[in-house]
């Protein structure tokens, strides 16, 4: 018989915590002075809430607060406990960040060295009836990482700090899009559990498309337990039980739900979820599952090695984005913040998010929302851009962490791929690691042996990939475009974005291009006067190596170099959107050779110039609107093929697509003269792509600088083609008129084109940071109109540059 009682030690549960600096480079007045703390929380957020530090995101405060990562911190609380007659008491910490010593009533009860796992400490002999004092002392993470390096040796990595020495969120030490705010704290819930006999240790409910739910329940027993226990599993109107002999650590219970409704990713069906209840005496565990099967086909074919993700036997073209921690201080995230950000992916037409290996295993709130909204999750194990020791003590921590992560996340219907690491196999092959490694193991044993074995044991229904990128053959370069998954980073780092068309990748799991955040986001934290891309504070919020130089070089012949800071902001945002859209249009035109694109990246963790589509204040950048267009279920593009132009159509729906397509060659001038027009019927089967060659009457321009193609389907799908870059394109100044009208929730701005108006964008946050707009990057031919709908603000008295922008105003 189980009798489990829980005492919540979080702030929300009523516990009063303080944090104090113990020793290190903290200001003298903070040493040994208690500051009110929140649990779950972290040092930075506690000091910020108490007014002890300025906002780390503002200005150049980041570097002024680096002392926090080198200071030892102590969290302390007292709590009252009443003896309850149970045999065993344990302190359960779901997350301690990272290197910590835990004491209760002055007695050490445990030490930790891994942010990514939970800990359970036996406190039966230490806990007393009445008042108890709990102290958790954290080493400064930067100091701890450096101390570990000094002890066990250095391993190649890509950061100022040796983040790979610790099992801690890598990007907390800074990244090329994130701040260096290495912190510490009790970052997930903490509690006392008191129990007798037997308790539930973990539950793994694995549901398949056949309606069968296999639930694996791990049990913990006291030494004196002598009675059989009964485990009951309820799901979908079915109930099954199993009797368990004392001491047995795992029991499997099988339920079959007749005619179970299948779970599908968005765009392919519904997302029915079934409540699962597991009972053991008076203890109850609840969760949700979706019945589905997921596979990845990597069987070699005539073109190399595919990477085809299928759900319930149906191939899925992946339209995705990479996900980084949604706040540099992850304890500020909750179910609502996750839902808002994941909705950004849904609204952009995505069906997959890749949880990147330099972050965290997100809370269940993240995966719950993905389950509900039909967003597949590609989950990296947490190894990124570095070599990792395979020796103790790190190896045991890696195994414990991986077992816990797979056990916790395996229930989620959205979980589609376990991935061993981010770029580490590629790094070993190509990033000059071999000399400093001097023959030492560097992590391959994790990715090729330990982790796949753990996944096969605990979550055999979910595919595993050793890395990203990965060719699925140790004798083929891991970033070979013909095999498996590919990261394309010569675009952005070295070459023009038109290079995307030189690749024919089977699956692209990273690619991207930088651009600044919204103007209001940028100016809320950057206070240089005058504002300049190379200003002191601006550079604090540009973390990429030579980032501003790459922004300028990336313009190529596409757009002119900016004349002022307003033009810089608009030009680089526009170029980011165009570059990424260019790549996705090309990848989708290659279907079925190409089976997916996962852009870097969806989100930001603070206000910064980055690759994100949605900035650190949650404002959708022009890139996001470009993604919404190119991730549409049905996409029309114009693609060059050898010596001709084709209309490429990708139909990513379950219904055949038949539409009349009109291709018009027009003048860019004010009259918008129609120079030639061709019409044809496009027939695209379900989940297919076709290409139609264009006749020379429209494909060949008489005056390339003054002409363009307008391609429109009768069902509303459309695209444009230009014969020259904007720097040579004859775009009329003053190519449109505007009118603003109030609406109940904001206002409308209607734009009427008098000539080709290219890439119209309205930025209401420049007038009011709370304002949001529903559309962006709209191209109009002469005589056409578009209405931007703005919410959260009142109609302005004036509209013009820099609030309303277009490509026209950059070249005139």
Predicted regions and their residues:
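Flexible loop/turn segments at secondary-structure boundaries
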Residues: 98-100, 143-144, 297, 325-328, ...
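The substrate-binding groove and active-site-proximal loops of carbohydrate-active enzymes
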Residues: 115, 176-179, 264-265, 322-335, ...
């Amino acid at each position: 018989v189980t009798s489990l009682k829980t005492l919540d030690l979080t702030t929300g549960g009523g516990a009063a915590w303080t944090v104090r600096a113990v020793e290190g480079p903290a200001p003298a007045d903070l040493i040994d002075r208690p500051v009110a703390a929140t649990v779950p929380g972290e040092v930075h957020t506690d000091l910020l809430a108490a007014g002890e530090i300025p906002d780390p995101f503002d200005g150049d405060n980041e570097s002024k607060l680096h002392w926090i990562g080198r200071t030892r911190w102590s969290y302390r609380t007292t709590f009252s406990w009443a003896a309850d007659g149970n045999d065993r008491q344990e302190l359960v910490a779901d997350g301690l960040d990272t290197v910590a010593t835990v004491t209760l009533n002055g007695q050490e009860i445990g030490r930790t060295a891994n942010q990514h796992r939970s800990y359970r400490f036996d406190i039966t002999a230490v806990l007393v009836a009445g008042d108890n004092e709990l102290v958790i002392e954290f080493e400064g993470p930067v100091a701890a990482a450096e101390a570990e390096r000094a002890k066990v040796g250095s391993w190649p990595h890509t950061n100022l700090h040796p983040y790979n020495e610790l099992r801690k969120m890598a990007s907390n030490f800074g990244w090329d899009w994130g701040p260096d705010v290495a912190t510490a704290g009790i970052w997930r819930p903490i509690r006392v559990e008191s129990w007798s006999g037997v308790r539930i240790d973990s539950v793994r409910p694995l549901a398949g498309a056949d309606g069968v739910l296999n639930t694996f329940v791990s049990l913990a027993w006291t030494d004196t337990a002598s009675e059989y226990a009964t485990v009951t599993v309820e799901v979908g109107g079915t109930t099954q039980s199993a009797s368990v002999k004392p001491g047995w650590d795992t029991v499997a219970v099988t339920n079959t739900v007749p005619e179970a409704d299948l779970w599908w990713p968005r765009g392919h069906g519904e997302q029915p979820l079934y409540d699962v209840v597991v009972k053991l005496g008076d203890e109850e565990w609840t969760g949700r599952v979706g019945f589905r099967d997921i596979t990845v086909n990597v069987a070699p074919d005539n073109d190399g090695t595919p990477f085809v993700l299928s759900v319930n036997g149906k191939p899925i073209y992946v339209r995705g984005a990479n996900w980084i921690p949604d706040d540099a201080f992850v304890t500020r995230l909750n179910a609502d913040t996750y839902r808002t950000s994941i909705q950004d992916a849904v609204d952009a037409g995505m069906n997959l998010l890749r949880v990147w290996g330099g972050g965290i295993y997100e809370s269940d709130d993240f995966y719950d929302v993905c389950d509900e909204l039909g967003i597949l999750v590609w989950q990296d194990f947490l190894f990124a851009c570095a070599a990792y020791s395979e020796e103790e003590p790190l190896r045991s921590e890696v195994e414990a962490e991986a077992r816990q992560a797979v056990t916790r996340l395996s229930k989620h219907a959205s979980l589609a791929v376990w991935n061993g690491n981010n770029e580490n196999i590629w790094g070993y092959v190509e990033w000059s690691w071999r000399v400093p490694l001097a023959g030492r193991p560097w992590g391959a044993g994790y990715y090729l042996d330990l982790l796949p074995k753990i996944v096969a044991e605990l979550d055999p229904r979910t595919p595993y990939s050793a890395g990203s990128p990965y060719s699925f053959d140790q004798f083929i370069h891991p970033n070979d475009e013909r095999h498996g998954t590919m990261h394309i980073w010569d675009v952005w780092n070295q070459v023009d974005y038109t290079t995307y068309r030189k690749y024919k990748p089977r699956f692209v799991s990273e690619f991207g291009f930088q651009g600044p955040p919204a103007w209001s986001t940028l100016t809320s934290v950057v206070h240089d006067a005058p504002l300049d891309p190379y200003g002191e504070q601006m550079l604090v919020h540009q973390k990429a190596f030579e980032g501003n130089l790459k922004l300028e070089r990336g313009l190529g012949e596409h757009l002119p170099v900016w004349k002022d800071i307003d033009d810089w902001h608009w030009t680089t945002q526009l170029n980011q959107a165009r570059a990424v859209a260019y790549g996705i249009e090309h990848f989708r035109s290659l279907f079925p050779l190409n089976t997916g694109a996962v852009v870097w990246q969806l989100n930001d963790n603070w206000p910064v110039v980055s690759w994100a589509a949605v900035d650190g204040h949650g404002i959708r950048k022009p890139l996001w609107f470009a993604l919404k267009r190119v991730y549409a279920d049905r996409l029309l593009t114009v693609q060059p093929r050898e010596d001709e132009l084709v209309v490429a159509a990708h139909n990513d729906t379950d219904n055949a697509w038949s539409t009349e397509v009109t291709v018009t060659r027009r003048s860019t001038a004010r009259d918008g003269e129609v120079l030639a027009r061709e019409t044809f019927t496009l027939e695209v089967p379900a989940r297919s792509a076709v290409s139609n060659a264009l006749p020379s009457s429209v494909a060949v321009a008489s005056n390339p600088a003054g002409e363009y193609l307008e391609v429109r389907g009768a069902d509303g799908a459309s695209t444009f083609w230009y014969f020259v870059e904007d720097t040579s394109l004859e775009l009329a100044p003053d190519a449109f008129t505007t009118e603003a009208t109030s609406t109940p929730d904001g206002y409308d701005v209607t734009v009427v084109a008098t000539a080709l108006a290219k890439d119209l964008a309205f930025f209401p946050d420049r007038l009011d940071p709370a304002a949001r707009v529903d559309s962006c990057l709209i191209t109009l031919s002469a005589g056409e109109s578009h209405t931007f709908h703005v919410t959260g603000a009142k109609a302005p008295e004036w509209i013009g540059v820099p609030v309303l922008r277009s490509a026209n105003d950059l070249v005139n």
